[in-house]
């Protein structure tokens, strides 16, 4: 399989013909931690499973093709992937970071900077090129963006920010979790590195914890591979298999997620209980604000079909309360100043019949008085 195929075909065929000896269509799960050698210097290409595993390699090769990268890397979580990227740098290096970045990313960057003299995060509105450029100093080494951002759904111009990064000799890192390569390919727009919480849309079934890095450039890929092997937070063979299996339907799922999200965003804008709806008109994620903070818990207790849970991107619809879940580690005054208010709810719109989702929301809204 080569990049001449469309993304739909690459996804549908993920893992097929990966075992020429047996012809297995489903990727085999290789649980072995060690691999025999025929003699000194006669490796099969696999030595120790932390370094390389046949099942994980299928996933890594596939995501590299999907994102048009030179190499892919699979980790035990999205946060493990970000930790590996942080290890490419050292204090007093700085990253410019989206101001409403995912709370887990904020927590890791904040802790590492304050306690381990790690990379310093500098938070700006990355939707503004002027703000990004104004924040660049002699210590700036990378720009890290989410687009759309989590949870305010702010979009960034990846191509223009990538030009700015190259102008200042900075690495451009894009978290593409929300859009996936089905809807966006940041490496094609000039980014150097793409990361994913593969737990979300790529695996897609709320049953595997996955982090992914896809990079361009031999030297950069070699550095990431060295840290991946040394740190060892690699994805297990079984989770690799689950992810390959799940991603086969990614194109179909993203279309349904997006169609449902567009309909739900329009529906929410018509409801008197809603103050605002944040939706970039692409993807399956949106956020909305209720008009009264006191309604939040009643609403979350009233939904029946939709699950109040702290994740996204699965087949089921989830609503998350950032104030006490994803962004709880950000001090309240700082969190609210960034726009992550106590009335804000994040909605991962699932694959259910959209009329059933609307009905569940409507019955929950009737409880708000």
Each language-model region and where it sits:
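A common structural junction motif
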Residues: 231-232, 303-311, 364-369
